[in-house]
Amino acid sequence: MQKISVASAALLLALSFQATAAEPKEEMTTSGIGITMLKEGSGASPKASDTVKVHYRGTLTDGKEFDSSYRRNEPATFPLNRVIPCWTEGVQKIKVGGKAKLVCPSNLAYGSRGVPGIPPNSTLIFEVELLDIAK
């Protein structure tokens, strides 16, 4: 009976270490963007001058969704240097095929002006899946 208990304890310990190691960690950029890699890509990373094709979901910190290409069932394509600074910097950290969570401080998003559906001075949270880079 004791052998089963020791084996069970060892298995639970191994599983808890594996679960802890598998949790993605948020990294902060020097500008203040929080980036968590949810899925590692295997392709190239874009440059600010590239046009990217992405699927994304944007929410406020309370979880309210303000935009989603998934909901529209159509990826978005845009020049990376023509979006909010958080995206220009953050999406460059993702490889094609990868997915990341970007936590964008308001000064790197829409700041004090806000936009319809996004109040002024809002921190924004995006899940961004990089599908392709058009050079």
Cite the ranges covered by each PLM segment.
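Cross-family detector of peptidyl-prolyl cis-trans isomerase
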Residues: Q2-K135
